[in-house]
Amino acid sequence: MQDTRTGLTPTVFRLTPPYTRFEEVANLDALQLPDLPLGSVLAIELPGHDGWADVAALAPRLRVRFPSAPVVLRVRGGAGVDPEEAARRAAPLHLRAVLGEDAPPRETLQAVLTDPASLTHELDDWLTVRGVAPPPELKGLIVDIFRQAPAYPRLHGLLQALGRPERTVRNWFQRAGLPGPGSWLAAAHAVYAALRLQRERQTSLLTIAVECGYSDHSSLSRQAVRLFGARPGEIRQTLGWEGLLDRWLGRAGVRAA
């Protein structure tokens, strides 16, 4: 997977919970989805100040191959790159974070990957990467459902606020071969709860469950298992929403690209 424009091959590392160690991926072509447990992150190391073309070529390919794993940039001191410049150049590539040589990986990743704002900011592009490509209006509605989900426990109220007829919307999703809008709303609620679990590791499961609209911690636990195949305790050790949404789509029968 080499970019012949510079002849440099960026090294890719895998981080898995508890995100304390960079594990080099020796053979990227042999890496498979089962090799990436829930919460995995892939880090592309900038091979030098002139290596941006290589990173730009590799990043979208990794994101398409492994939509369940956020892709980030790793910059070591020897690369000679200003951190602000690295962040500016990484953003258009949808590299979710920039990991410096001295910063603890988990702390840096947690601040970015559990931010609810990043979900709605990145969701449109991520759906395309995942192979979910409905008409633009329908994709925009999916993003709106996620954006508005914290304020609306029920679909009817949300669609009413958006000025969308519920029957028409259900027909749109059915024609696109996607889970219904109510299922997307349920997934959104569960993802927001998951992000809080990841971000607020000392807050009790009951508190998060109730504040996220569930009757109790058992209700949230059942929903997490049903949608994501993972219990809250497991989710709490991970970071990011990509793996959760990828699992939910897979369990709902929406195949990856």
Descriptions of predicted regions:
Residues 1-36:
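Extended, compositionally biased accessory segments flanking or bridging domains
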Residues 24-36, 154, 216, 231, ...:
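Alpha-helix N-cap recognition
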Residues 26-68, 73-86:
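Conserved phosphotransfer microenvironments
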Residues 65-148:
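Compact structured core domains
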Residues 133-180, 201-212:
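DNA-binding recognition helix and immediately preceding turn/loop
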Residues 170-184, 224-232:
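HTH DNA-binding helix-turn interface
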Residues 176-212, 239-257:
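Terminal helix-turn-helix DNA-binding modules in bacterial transcription factors
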Residues 200-236:
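Sequence-specific DNA-binding recognition helix
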